[in-house]
Design a protein with these regions (language model features):
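Active-site mouth loops of central-metabolism enzymes
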Residues: 13-24, 83-99
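Divalent metal-dependent hydrolysis catalytic cores, especially in the metallo-beta-lactamase
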Residues: 29-51, 65-73, 109-121, 130, ...
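Metal-cofactor-binding active-site regions of metalloenzymes
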Residues: 64-89
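Active-site neighborhoods of metal-dependent hydrolases
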Residues: 103-117, 121, 166, 170-325
Length: 398
């Protein structure tokens, strides 16, 4: 293939996807990712009974699909947020240390590539999960548990998602508020996990942002210089850049499974019931810039298909938001290539274009270092050494 006058970059990652969150998308996702130049994905949580078949299908010999790395279910606490009753089934409970050890053994046996700790775990269970993951050689991802301070979590995990709950440690007296949250998390009334988490977010998120303490926040970020932050700005800051206001949104919907496209098309003007207040979106953009200035590594992930995150397409929106937040185009590209490889200890095999590296490549018609939006100008993809031209990529989607 003649690439004269075009631009070659390493294959892109979406570092935060959910293959099983909405099963209308599961079968279509591999083609949608490749169609947009995403050659590797990290599935950050779902039940094994749903995720394993999807992973096995993607990994089967001859499959035209991205590389996939998966975590299995979210490792939550006594009260599970994504419990399958009040929220989609993504998590499992770890009410005590013995259960946590048993769950880690089961996930390791199932062949997970990493594990993800969720928001309702206790400090005691968190410590056990960290110990087990380290003993088993499994990288750790997660949200900052509501029972803990971000500065006590970051040094023990390799990545954190959504900037979640970091604002609660960026105040003058975070120890007092974490003690308050622990009292609420005792949950004597047995409130469902998802409801309990939402109550705590409402009670502490915006007040913490309003009480921002720069000295305290710098201390928090100093603890995270070896922890990849995956801010999912296209989700956190959805109100600042709704995808359905873009001129190409109709083309995006046309590639999606018909039932999901119809639903998104009907609800997009209302933000799907999401808030249009920009306090948290603005904070998210501010915090990513502060992290960038503080030397905290940033990874690019979307949370697709949550929050109008069209698989594949949304990764380019995330790169644009990272640049808007203060990263250079090169740094944004590293967030979708080098950083994910580093998480898995694969920086000697993936993430850059060098002899001997895995053959995952994307050919663009424009230079993304001049304009990050040009990562959308995909002309061809090499996935696992196989070349797919534009016609072949378009044939992967409806």
């Amino acid at each position: 293939m003649d690439g004269s006058g075009q631009y070659l970059i390493p294959g892109l990652w979406d570092f935060h996807v959910h293959l099983a969150y909405d099963q209308r998308f599961t079968e279509a996702m591999p083609g949608l990712f490749l169609n947009h130049g995403i050659t590797s994905i990290r599935d950050t949580g779902g039940p094994l009974e749903l995720v394993l078949p999807a992973v096995e299908s993607i990994r089967r010999e001859g499959a035209v699909a991205p590389r996939v790395f998966f975590a299995g279910p979210l490792l939550d606490g006594e009260h599970v947020v994504y419990d399958g009753d009040n929220m989609p089934l993504l998590g499992i409970g770890n009410p005590d240390e013995a259960t946590a050890r048993a769950n880690m053994a089961r996930l390791d046996e199932a062949g997970v590539d990493f594990v993800k700790i969720y928001e309702m775990v206790s400090p005691e269970v968190f410590a056990v999960l960290v110990e087990e993951a380290q003993a088993r050689g499994l990288p750790m991802d997660g949200h900052v548990p509501l029972s803990m301070q971000a500065r006590d979590v970051g040094p023990h995990v390799q990545s954190l998602e959504h900037l979640r709950n970091i604002e609660m440690d960026c105040i003058a007296n975070p120890r007092a508020t974490v003690a308050e949250r622990r009292l609420v998390l005792a949950n004597p009334e047995g409130v469902p996990g998802g409801t309990l988490r939402s109550q705590l977010h409402r009670a502490y998120r915006i007040p913490s942002i309003e009480a921002y303490d720069e000295v305290g926040c710098r201390e928090v970020l100093a603890s995270m210089t070896s922890t990849i932050q995956v801010p999912t700005l296209r989700l956190n800051a959805l109100a600042l850049q709704p995808p359905f206001t873009r001129a190409d949104w109709g083309e995006v919907l046309a590639k999606l499974p018909e039932d999901a496209a119809a639903e998104w098309g009907a609800m997009d003007g209302s933000m799907g019931g999401r808030s249009t207040d920009t306090t948290y979106p603005d904070w998210s953009m501010f915090l990513v810039n502060l992290m960038h200035e503080s030397g905290v590594p940033i990874g690019a992930g979307t949370d697709t298909p949550i929050g109008f995150a069209a698989p594949g397409y949304s990764l380019h929106s995330e790169l644009e938001m990272l640049v808007r937040a203060g990263l250079s185009p090169m740094e944004a590209l590293r967030a979708a290539t080098v950083r994910p490889a580093e998480f898995f200890g694969l920086e000697g095999e993936m993430g850059t274009i060098e002899p001997g590296r895995l053959a995952d490549l994307v050919l663009l018609s424009g230079n993304p270092l001049d304009d990050i939006t040009l990562t959308r100008s995909v002309q061809a993809v090499v996935t696992k050494g196989h070349l797919l031209n534009r016609a072949a990529l378009d044939a992967l989607v409806r």
